[in-house]
Amino acid sequence: MSRSKRDNNFYSVEIGDSTFTVLKRYQNLKPIGSGAQGIVCAAYDAILERNVAIKKLSRPFQNQTHAKRAYRELVLMKCVNHKNIIGLLNVFTPQKSLEEFQDVYIVMELMDANLCQVIQMELDHERMSYLLYQMLCGIKHLHSAGIIHRDLKPSNIVVKSDCTLKILDFGLARTAGTSFMMTPYVVTRYYRAPEVILGMGYKENVDLWSVGCIMGEMVCHKILFPGRDYIDQWNKVIEQLGTPCPEFMKKLQPTVRTYVENRPKYAGYSFEKLFPDVLFPADSEHNKLKASQARDLLSKMLVIDASKRISVDEALQHPYINVWYDPSEAEAPPPKIPDKQLDEREHTIEEWKELIYKEVMDLEERTKNGVIRGQPSPLGAAVINGSQHPSSSSSVNDVSSMSTDPTLASDTDSSLEAAAGPLGCCR
């Protein structure tokens, strides 16, 4: 594309302290969140005739870590295509050459709210179960490609008013290696698994602890383990769940083991005490979902010893979840990631910049006339299986009144105010 023609395709608008220079197809930009990794705006796509979210990466070439994170996010979003993972619609840059290249814009599906708002609602069993089912389907799809999300938290999970749920933000995702020697400083503290807190290394079911924390928060309407730092976080966990057994202690590094063994010993509480029936909604007559089933699932996810924690496949088959089971969702073909050494790559900033520029140019070429060519639409229609999903006629728990503003809250702090409201049909 010639320089003059490229210039004519873009316009600039001030968003807070930042300037968004976007393709003219994107109109009516409105800020909806900001954070360490970038600023997110809602916009209207005149070509696709739909609302979208545009994320401007924050200084992607500031250092090698930022550059590597940006490259990883682009590669993973391009490869992953599942109804419970946020869909990539477009990627572009207003710069005209590699030498000028400095800004990356990622266009994604726009959702109605993040899970932080939904957690404050009184959900019935159908809606809670269905939201968790979708979460697990998205996680399994990532795990099937060896991708550990590591950053699951309510603000990284978004929903629409029809109860559709999607996982987002892959800037901190990592492909699973053989050594599992991974940095523990990743997940928002409250949702960190014990193996992360204790620097033990981790495998895929580190994400199941995070789901357990989120589910517990949906039940209790409060954070389960609100630690101020790693030490306080560990103390909060063992005070409630109990000090782990000696076999677990043997797995710890010597210095960590010494500290943990010298802490006061806690018996912990039963899950009936932590999550009494009074916190749960009434048992479901239609799908036979009960508080006892929900509590049993929590007890299998919130397990300190990862070797005894439930896997995503086991969670999907749990009685509280499997009423929604659909092979097309839970057993979708794994994404094909061409760069098998995605997380082992080490480059200079300039080398990362060139790699990212090539990715952006490739995606620009593939999205000239709409969504990415060669990739199925991320907005696949919901498949209704044998189990009836929460009825659209139900006025109980409808998220449509939760907020008038949409959101796509990746690593950003959503600007939306949580508002009480009913949560609508789930499928």
From Swiss-Prot:
User: Phosphotyrosine modification sites?
Assistant: 185
Q: Which SUPFAM superfamilies match?
A: Protein kinase-like (PK-like)
Q: Which residues form the Protein kinase domain?
A: 26-321
Instruction: Tell me where in or outside the cell this protein is found.
Output: Cytoplasm; Nucleus; Synapse
Identify the catalytic residues: 151
Q: What class of enzyme is it?
A: transferase
The Swiss-Prot or TrEMBL record annotates one GO molecular function as:
protein serine/threonine kinase activity
Protein origin, superkingdom: Eukaryota
Q: Which residues bind ATP?
A: 32-40, 55
Q: Which residues form a coiled coil?
A: none
Q: Which residues carry this modification: Phosphoserine?
A: 377
Give the record's GO biological process terms: cellular response to amino acid starvation; cellular response to lipopolysaccharide; cellular response to mechanical stimulus; cellular response to oxidative stress; cellular response to reactive oxygen species; cellular senescence; energy homeostasis; Fc-epsilon receptor signaling pathway
Query: Which positions does the record annotate as the modified residue Phosphothreonine?
Result: 183
Outcome, altering residue 171 to S:
In a renal clear cell carcinoma sample; somatic mutation
**S-nitrosocysteine found at:** 116
Changing residue 185 to F has the effect of: Phosphorylation blocked
| Keyword Chloroplast found | no
Keywords assigned by UniProt, alphabetized: ATP-binding, Biological rhythms, Cytoplasm, Kinase, Nucleotide-binding, Nucleus, Phosphoprotein, S-nitrosylation, Serine/threonine-protein kinase, Synapse, Transferase
Residue ranges, compositional bias (Low complexity):
387-403
What is the protein's given name? Mitogen-activated protein kinase 8
Species in which this protein is naturally found:
Homo sapiens (Human)
Q: Which gene encodes it?
A: MAPK8
